[in-house]
Amino acid sequence: MALVRINGLERHYQMASETVRALDGVDLEIIEGERIILLGPSGSGKTTLLNCLSALDSPTGGEYQFSGIEVPKNDSEAMTTFRRENIGYVFQFFNLLQDLTVLENLLLIQELAGSRDEDRARNLLSLVGLENEVDRFPA
């Protein structure tokens, strides 16, 4: 079974007097365990594709599935729920808030997501070997 299946994916942007076709009929199938690389020049649509796949942006056309689940489009709440339940996303330029401790940074993220669970935050830090760093400030 395909982990990701994309059929005719499009993402067009209206810019002043022209339409920019960032994605125009993309077809792709990624099998579970398969590794791929998105390679192309600046402005070729790599980030746009990833943003659509992770439900950070809605395509203007086409269909796509993640683990057999149709990825929601044009519905902010459904897209957020899908992202929280199915997608892990590491931003290229991710920064911690320098005036908060490691633990406080995690708790802030939880609060922004609508919950706060210090035990869970500490457990997550333990899973990545940072249990002794909770009171440190990012360097």
Feature annotation, model-predicted:
Residues 97-109:
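Short coil-to-helix segment of the ABC ATPase nucleotide-binding domain corresponding to the Q-loop/switch region
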Residues 40-44:
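Walker A (P-loop) phosphate-binding loop of ABC-type ATPase nucleotide-binding domains
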Residues 17-20, 71-88:
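ABC ATPase NBD coupling module
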Residues 5, 69-70, 116-133:
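Conserved ABC ATPase "signature" region
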Residues 62-73:
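Conserved ABC transporter NBD signature motif
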Residues 14-16, 107-118, 127:
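ABC-type ATPase nucleotide-binding domains, specifically the catalytic core motifs of the NBD
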Residues 1-3, 12-25, 76:
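A short, flexible loop at the N-terminus of ABC-type nucleotide-binding domains that lies
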Residues 54:
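Helix-to-loop junction immediately C-terminal to a conserved catalytic motif
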